């Protein structure tokens, strides 16, 4: 299909540079979302390791871990699709080059941070709520290290595995952009919302990734704050409250609740984009500085969270709501700051090692790199 015969529905690549406002908001969201993921995984220190979770703590976890934090993964897929699909055009050379880059940037860190956990289990010992050498041997060392049909040893890294699969099959998404972009968007959403009740599935991965490319190629104005950002944010707050109290409100059909939950994740994308527009967030020097190492924080946050909480619980057993809520935030934020400092040190002292560990991601010298 040549350019002269290009139909009106075909979504071509967006070749212009990203608007500075959009670039800064994406950058700061990286560390914000990673922070939410660290906090979410650290919640097990309260729900699993502490007897008698308080009512206030349970409500906080239901709102944050049960709804707000769930937005992080689809938003990461949406951002990845936005940045990748906005310019990528399919050719054998381009596809091969992309696969080589993703092998370095995704697969190598994925294998490294799973393999070092295998070594930890073998030489040091088990890690509470994460596993042991006997466990991974019984499950299959190769299978668990690569996460084939199961969660990988370092369970949060399933995201990298799924993202790599999405990149491998990205030519299919480009065909949708060429022939039927709207049909592709609706089809992937229906598959995600209706086929599997789980919030995170390959259907959802592909939908969010495709949505990012769709937004980029339709040139939706993302700068500043538009009416749809305000409306979507308000609806997210309202629907989150409805889902938290769905039983008293009479929403007892689980299939209905699941569909509403996934619709709310979409509203969550808008909510976080709106939040990133606030100057205190978008122009925050510290957040931009930390964003340089957000990938390292993600890669290393487990088993760091589990080990830190084990040590902390040895000297402090939170017994009421105030203490349990404090434990949740202190343990999560402490790990984030600690890993950021570690990343700063490694990137300065051994930049080549840091580049290998993080898939050749060398932090820029600018504050919002």
Place the predicted regions along the sequence by residue.
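Membrane-cytosol interface segments of multi-pass membrane proteins
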Residues: 1-188, 319-369
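Aromatic-anchored segments of alpha-helical transmembrane domains
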Residues: 39-42, 186-200, 235-248, 303
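Long hydrophobic alpha-helical segments that form multi-pass transmembrane helix bundles
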Residues: 134-148, 188, 200-218, 222-232
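Membrane-interface helix-boundary motifs at transmembrane edges
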Residues: 22-23, 90-98, 172-181, 217-229, ...
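Specific transmembrane alpha-helix
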Residues: 73-85, 164-171, 198-225, 241, ...
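Interfacial loop-to-helix transition and helix-capping segments at the boundaries
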Residues: 61-74, 148-162, 193-211, 224, ...
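Alpha-helical transmembrane segments and terminal signal-anchor/GPI-anchor hydrophobic tails
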Residues: 4-17, 221-289, 293-296, 303-312, ...
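A short secondary-structure junction motif
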Residues: 45, 311-315
